[in-house]
Amino acid sequence: KQDCLDLPPKRRQMLPVTLSEAEGQGFQHRLQLKVEDYRRRAAAGLVRRDAEALAVLTALRQIGAEYKLPAAADLVAQLQAEGQAVVVFTAFVAAAQLLQQRLGGALLTGRLAAAERQSVVDRFQAGEEQLLISTYGVGGLGFTLHRARHVVLLERPWTPGDAEQAEDRCHRIGMQGTLECHWLQLGVADQLVDGLIADKAERIALLLSRGQAQLDRQPLPRMVQQLLDQW
């Protein structure tokens, strides 16, 4: 896409989040409770293991998003102090609301009436807001946010391509300079989802180059089941 449309560069960087000892213990304890509850119900035959595994993955990602909020807030505050316009994407409305309460800025989620969403984007594009916080489901498609030079992904959606689509709301014709994409990472849920995204990119590259290599890939529910069973 970048070569075809003569777009400026897009640079992606992974930012591991470091927790204090107390925060790390609290984070791991909450994850462990979710996993143990899944195992009990799965062993008792109370749930479909594949469907429940995805629900648990969502819960683990949501816990991770909560613990990444201070790091995300610090990063955004630093960028704003430098005069940068920033877009933040998250899968979770609660995380978006908490971040907006802490930093201000515009909020774009499914709880905003459809008729009002474009006006929020327009205010950001016009420079009336330096920060736009959005969920993937609302802001990740259809809008142009190319005023931002920085986009922060609190976590990534597991559907291949959705992270790229969200970044590309800012990576548009008419933007000035390199787009910096910041991926915050914390815990095994992020490792799994980001690994799937990297795997998808490798498959596309092989397809485009007509490579003959065969890549084994399990369905996501099975991968999550194995992760939870081996926890």
Q: Residue locations for each model-derived region?
A:
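Conserved nucleotide-binding/hydrolysis micro-motifs of P-loop NTPases
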Residues: 20-23, 94-95, 113, 138-140, ...
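Alpha-helical elements of the RecA-like P-loop NTPase motor core of helicases
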Residues: 25, 70, 97, 118, ...
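Conserved helicase ATPase core of P-loop NTP-dependent helicases/translocases
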Residues: 77, 85-89, 96-98, 104-140, ...
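Hydrophobic residues at beta-strand termini and immediately following loops
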Residues: 15-17, 108-110, 184
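A conserved SF2-helicase RecA2
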Residues: 158-231
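Conserved beta-strand segments of the P-loop GTPase G domain that flank and frequently precede/overlap
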Residues: 89, 134-135, 153-155, 184-185
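Inter-lobe coupling linker of SF2 helicases/translocases
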Residues: 1-84
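A short beta-strand element within the Helicase C-terminal
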Residues: 143-156, 179-183
